Amino acid sequence: MNEISIIILAAGNGTRMKSNKSKVLHTLCGEPMISHILKKSYEISNDVRIVLSYQFEEVKNSVLSEFKDVKIYKQDTINRPGTAGAAEAALENLNSKKTLVICGDMPLVEVNELKSLCDNTADISLSAFRAKNPFGYGRVVLNQQNVIKIVEQKDANDDEKKIDLCNAGAYCFDTNLLKNIIPLIKNENASREFYLTDAIELALKQGFMVKSVLVDETNFMGINDKFALSIAEEIMQNRIKENLMKNGVIMSLPDTIFIDSRAEFEGECKLEPNVVILGNSFIKNSHIKSGSVIEFSEVCDSDIGPMAHLRPNSKIYKTHIGNFVELKNASLNEVKAGHLSYLGDCEINSGTNIGCGTITCNYDGKKKHKTIIGKNVFIGSDTQLVAPVNVADDTLIAAGSTVTKDTNKGDLVITRGKQINKAGYFYKFFGKNDEK
């Protein structure tokens, strides 16, 4: 038997997001909102269940692509609308001692606060916070510090609307109690929905113990629209960057830097202003200069930028990447590429110098092709390498060349028209200066 099971409620339409995409698939620091919740859930339990409805297949496929073991259920929103109906959908074969019920739109929640809900002897523990502006939240009604009920904003009377103790939306139930009490919940309210919060009052009437656990309002912030999404992302960004800086990463003007929640750093790293790190990028002992973007790539013992762009699947080791250089699916090891180049679908080996304006022409209109450049190659400025092509070790390519054939070790490659100087032709074409 699992000590704790977790049910994540993610069946809502999320109409205030004004999007055809499910609310829980909107990204926060690079990952879908629901992924943040699932990762934290798996730190607590290996029995994690999620209840869906709106955009069911889309959300299901997204979740299962990353979390293979999660159990997915569909809510009957016609006959059993509301949070109690959602939780009810996930009760099948639930046999843990306790069940933690949380919302899928709370990506900032911390694991320690979820654990604190379950670490007591109450039959039901509910999360609550003191709000400066409680409008819109369910109110936690107390009598001599004991929880009596939770009342939703639209169902609250004038006195209840003055209460500042608000429901944070996470609950830990004794599992047997949860299974027995959900069928008793009625939909006698303004929305005609089955509220999970009504389980509190029903449990109290049966003599069960209910406790509220104070939590941080920010951590339990619900994302209901895109403005709230932007606020939550800023909070999460600050957490990510604070943690990285405390672990040795140097950031200049960190408010201008964006770091994906999946990115990893190791060793001595420095990020200058306006740097963007996306996906599961890995940065080790490297200096990322202003305005550079790194996507799903690996950078070790290198300096990048300013204004460089590493697109997905680039692997950079002991390399200098200068300004306005773009890489895509490129592997560079001990290479210098200082200026204004595109290096895509390529492998470049140690000691090679890439001249300004070098391009790997990797796409023929139908397929992508690979360029392989050996060791100690010198590529002059404004060179085009038409893939598929292999440049052997110790090759010298003259500036302005278009390389379409493989080279041999030690070759000089030059492909350009012969230069002709015609004496006096300027004056013939434009006339002499005194005639202008």
Curated annotation (Swiss-Prot):
Necessary cofactors: Mg(2+)
Question: Which of this chain's residues are annotated to bind acetyl-CoA?
Answer: 362-363, 381, 399, 416
Cite the EC number.
2.7.7.23, 2.3.1.157
Give me the comment on cofactor binding. Binds 1 Mg(2+) ion per subunit.
- Give me any GO biological process, just one: regulation of cell shape
Q: What is its main location?
A: cytoplasm
Q: Which gene carries the instructions for this protein?
A: glmU
> Pathway of this protein?
Nucleotide-sugar biosynthesis; UDP-N-acetyl-alpha-D-glucosamine biosynthesis; N-acetyl-alpha-D-glucosamine 1-phosphate from alpha-D-glucosamine 6-phosphate (route II): step 2/2; Nucleotide-sugar biosynthesis; UDP-N-acetyl-alpha-D-glucosamine biosynthesis; UDP-N-acetyl-alpha-D-glucosamine from N-acetyl-alpha-D-glucosamine 1-phosphate: step 1/1; Bacterial outer membrane biogenesis; LPS lipid A biosynthesis
Keyword Cell wall biogenesis/degradation recorded = yes
Q: Which HAMAP family match?
A: GlmU
Q: Which organism is it from?
A: Campylobacter fetus subsp. fetus (strain 82-40)
From the Swiss-Prot or TrEMBL record, give the protein name: Bifunctional protein GlmU
Q: Where in the cell is it found?
A: Cytoplasm
